[in-house]
From Swiss-Prot:
Pfam families documented for this protein: Globin
Entry's Gene Ontology BP terms: hydrogen peroxide catabolic process
Record-linked PANTHER family: HEMOGLOBIN FAMILY MEMBER, HEMOGLOBIN SUBUNIT ALPHA
InterPro entries on file: Globin, Globin-like_sf, Globin/Proto, Hemoglobin_a-typ, Hemoglobin_oxygen_transport, Hemoglobin_pi
Protein's name according to its UniProt entry: Hemoglobin subunit alpha
Residues the entry annotates as binding O2: H58
Subunit structure as annotated in this protein's UniProt entry: Heterotetramer of two alpha chains and two beta chains.
Keyword DNA-binding in annotation: no
Naturally occurring in which organism (per UniProt): Eudyptes chrysocome
Binding site residues for heme b: H87
SUPFAM superfamilies: Globin-like
A GO MF term: oxygen binding
Tissue-by-tissue expression: Red blood cells.
Length: 141
């Protein structure tokens, strides 16, 4: 459960990334594909090379969805309902991949905003990303 302080920390971080959605999203995906190559199996039709237009476009979608969840932090399930349906019913993404993506996102935040990622903010972001992952996997059951 996200506390009021967690919510404030998450909103603070996401206020810094809105103008970098494509860049940070693509970097998160590239990092995930490199670190966890098994995640590439969901993107057989993508050019997965650095700088790929497809990775940039999908990265922007990922970052935009995370921003949407942060903007509706009191109703993440409502904000991501359609995305949850898509991943559970059509794409059938292995739920562990959401955790891997979250870890890569935290690394990207640490690289670009090291002073903002205090231990407290890191913990808040981790809780938020777990909440997002739980929402995205809730319709698998």
């Amino acid at each position: 459960v996200l506390s009021a302080n967690d919510k404030s920390n998450v909103k603070g971080v996401f206020s810094k990334i809105s103008s970098h959605a494509e860049e940070y999203g693509a970097e998160t995906l590239e990092r995930m594909f490199t670190t966890y190559p098994q995640t590439k199996t969901y993107f057989p039709h993508f050019d997965l090379h650095h700088g790929s237009a497809q990775v940039k476009a999908h990265g922007k979608k990922v970052a935009t969805a995370l921003m949407e969840a942060a903007n509706h932090i009191d109703d993440i399930a409502g904000a991501l309902s359609k995305l949850s349906d898509l991943h559970a019913q059509k794409l059938r993404v292995d739920p562990v991949n959401f955790k891997l993506l979250g870890q890569c996102f935290l690394v990207v935040m640490a690289i670009h905003h090291p002073s903002a990622l205090t231990p407290e903010v890191h913990a808040s972001l981790d809780k938020f990303l777990c909440a997002v992952g739980n929402v995205l996997t809730s319709k698998y059951r």
